[in-house]
Amino acid sequence: MTANLTHLQRLEAESIHIMRGVAANFSKPVMLYSIGKDSSVLLHLAMKAFYPAKPPFPFLHVDTTWKFREMIEFRDRMAAELGFDLLVHINEEGVRDGINPFDHGSNVHTHIMKTVALRQALDKYGFDAAFGGARRDEEKSRAKERVFSFRTASHTWDPKNQRPEMWKIYNTRVAQGESIRVFPLSNWTELDIWQYILQEGIPIVPLYFAKKRPVVNRGGMTIMVDDDRMKLLPGETVEERMVRFRTLGCYPLTGAIDSCAATLEDIVSEMLTARTSERQGRLIDRDEAGSMEKKKREGYF
Amino acid sequence: MLSSNAAAAVADAETETADIRAYLSSQERKTLLRFLTCGSVDDGKSTLIGRLLYDTKLIFEDQLAALEQDSKKHGTNGGEIDFALLVDGLEAERQQGITIDVAYRFFATPKRKFIVADTPGHEQYTRNMATGASTADLAVVLVDARQGVLQQTRRHSIIASLLGIRYIVVAVNKIDLVDFDEQVFAKITADYDAFAKDLGFSSIVAIPMSARHGDNVTRISERTPWYAGPSLIEHLETVDVAGESVAQPFRFPVQYVNRPNLDFRGFAGTIASGSVAVGDEVVVAKSGRRTRVKRIVTYDGDLPSAFEGQAITVVLEDEVEVSRGEILVAPEARPDVADQFTANIVWFDEHPLLPGRMYILRTETDEVSATVSQLKHRVNINNFAHEAAKCLELNAVGVCNLSLQSPIAFDPFGKNRSTGSFILIDRVTNATVGAGMILHPLRRAANIHWQALDVTKESRATLKHQKPAVLWFTGLSGSGKSTVANLLEKKLHAAGRHTYILDGDNVRHGLNRDLGFTEEDRVENIRRVAEVARLMADAGLIVLVSFISPFRAERRMARDLMGEGEFIEVFVDTPFEECAKRDPKGLYARALKGELKNFTGIDSPYEAPENPDLHLHTVGRAPEDMADELETWLRERGYC
């Protein structure tokens, strides 16, 4: 009978099932909200899962203070429109020490402003489960991760010793201080995400659509000059180009692609002919071999 | 006015938009096949998946560049592209050249979408293979043409069969390394068929292939002219795994009660089987209450009916009590409701399954404490023989009777994978230690009723002017448990209290004379003593239990048997060296010489209590002094 459901309906039902299981089993869940397309889908699914109630957990944005300005505007608008409970956490020590991606490099910046900040927020509120939007098709170490992924009290992941995960029966038991990262979009692909956004009319940050934007070429990537904290290096010039973003993160670390795709249909058709993966635009994955697995073991999402 | 060029461009764009929509809707109607690759180490599972992804053009340029670089660094093909590195994503896997955990990969052909689970071949990681198999409908079992059917081939096939997989592909891989010899293929096929005939598979399709070179993976190879069957991908695209599925009765396990305000009370869940419509009569499985479906609520509007796989919220006509763990079912076809049943169990943990030890049993939505009351037999992986066993070791498969603290609603696993499955969780570590597939309920559960008695525990205790309690003394042999317990009982007795001491050595002379010192027997030893202590507390006594009781899980089980505040854990904490020095019975000397096996603290572990109610550090203290402390503690809390 399952054959009667379309592919997206099956994925949607699976994600909703996972979210309800978390709400029923954990005393203090939270949904990580990173403002990107996957987070937008996650948010939409959460609205569906608990309808007519609002999602019974808050949404947490870990703000590195280097996000695109349009992302922050979008975040605040969505929170106001949908009326969900938004928490924003910034690593104030990092801000005080002036940590930034230009002087400290992507590694140090991401570790302090994102991974450490996330651990601070989880400890501060005492969350025992945290939803993330990671998908298994994104990257090799993510392809190995469980839907319910156990973290020790110090937020570390032990990839060599994951709990077996049988059927749709999830082991949600944790001791004091331990927690579970939950990935309801595990079985979605990038194409599924876009198709679902198209089908459901889910709002997304305008940066995903092509537009003339001020960019510079740096280290083989096209970086958008989003504010005056970005100083030009000798020989660099700002040019206005038609670009868009396949993923969104800190603006100095996120590469734009040349594109004319101004509608969702354009984006999907561009994707269907794409010859590179979406994470190619992420500087942090390429820093060192196995870098994503290493970050995840340290508590990165 | 648009220029003609601009108008054409708009028209093009509109056509393109329409094309994309049409393309996407055709994608939507594709069926999905979930399968896994399994088999022994080095049979080429990861390589096969890498080959499938590569040949179906699902590898992006940046990934291919990374793969070429990785192949030079870690590859096992002498610099040639090593497809296994596409899926072996963990650093440890790449360094060791093995698969440790299951990887999920996604690909599609014009005919179908696929989710493939690449599972590890090492016996050590069988639990990760089972994880991948539990959500799959088909298994591709790889066999190295040079090796033939191995123990792991058999183990994985048995587990696939137990987990409900009915469709098998035997991929006879590395056929190039046996010169594409038809006889080798025929022999392996015959061996596999002979072995698997009792595993209940609906179809077994054998394909000769070379994952490394691509023969018969996505295209038929000219190098196996004697093979007339389909390529792997052709078979995967066309195999019908829905098969003979008959309409199943309605099952709706309730996951979450949604109650945003006083006017709305909905039961959220995913339909496990069958369908339901507004107005249908449904029964709450455990309580037996009947009611009707008033509304089927979704975010996209109410539905007139819903079917298997849909995540919905049901509103009922009547205010019946329904909580998480209940199942709403069709009145004419109800599930079993019982607290005892028989099940197949696959064991995942380094610590063996022990009959009598209490575990947490969890179904899709329910959770209850459970013990294995009887281990009926272990299955021999090589010949399916039923072997007598006292415990199930890591990766073993067996048939067990389970006894639960309260009933659950379920179907046999053969009828329904969702409502017939469960996992077992260790109560101390919270690890997932086993997976179970229910065979049938045990009727004897239904025939033993609790006899209600008029004289209660409270009335018995009141007559004695005391509060019943179980003081559980745990500690190493020779730590002083019996000495302190004996002194305390003398004091309580002198004060007119009704007491009894259950002493480890003494009980082993009678009630537990049939038990030895293996881990299984120690668990049963404690279970019996805990039950006796419970009866004595029920009689209103203050019970002093003096047992080494080395395992946390059993002390936890004893605590759970007693009423609130009745169980008092006393940790008699004497360091090992001190006990060995005192050695009142000469046991340490013998154990250290190797004359006594399974001696706690030497070759059998002692798990110290983490939060005992009373912690006695005995070194430098007189036993009298400690007995006084205990008596004061009891008096202050009103036990005596």
Swiss-Prot record, chain A:
The EC number(s) this enzyme carries: 2.7.7.4
| Class of enzymatic activity (EC top level) | transferase
Instruction: Return one Gene Ontology term, BP aspect.
Output: hydrogen sulfide biosynthetic process
Annotated pathway: Sulfur metabolism; hydrogen sulfide biosynthesis; sulfite from sulfate: step 1/3
Q: Where is this region: Disordered?
A: 282-301
Q: Keyword set for this entry? A: ATP-binding, Nucleotide-binding, Nucleotidyltransferase, Transferase
Q: What Gene Ontology terms describe what this protein does at the molecular function level?
A: ATP binding; sulfate adenylyltransferase (ATP) activity
Q: Does the keyword S-adenosyl-L-methionine apply?
A: no
A Pfam family assignment:
PAPS_reduct
**Catalytic activity annotated for this protein?**
sulfate + ATP + H(+) = adenosine 5'-phosphosulfate + diphosphate
What the protein does? With CysN forms the ATP sulfurylase (ATPS) that catalyzes the adenylation of sulfate producing adenosine 5'-phosphosulfate (APS) and diphosphate, the first enzymatic step in sulfur assimilation pathway. APS synthesis involves the formation of a high-energy phosphoric-sulfuric acid anhydride bond driven by GTP hydrolysis by CysN coupled to ATP hydrolysis by CysD.
PANTHER family named among the record's database cross-references? SULFATE ADENYLYLTRANSFERASE SUBUNIT 2
Stated family: Belongs to the PAPS reductase family. CysD subfamily.
- What does the record note on quaternary structure? Heterodimer composed of CysD, the smaller subunit, and CysN.
Q: What is this protein called?
A: Sulfate adenylyltransferase subunit 2
**Which species is the source of this protein?**
Chelativorans sp. (strain BNC1)
Q: What is the lineage of its organism?
A: Bacteria, Pseudomonadati, Pseudomonadota, Alphaproteobacteria, Hyphomicrobiales
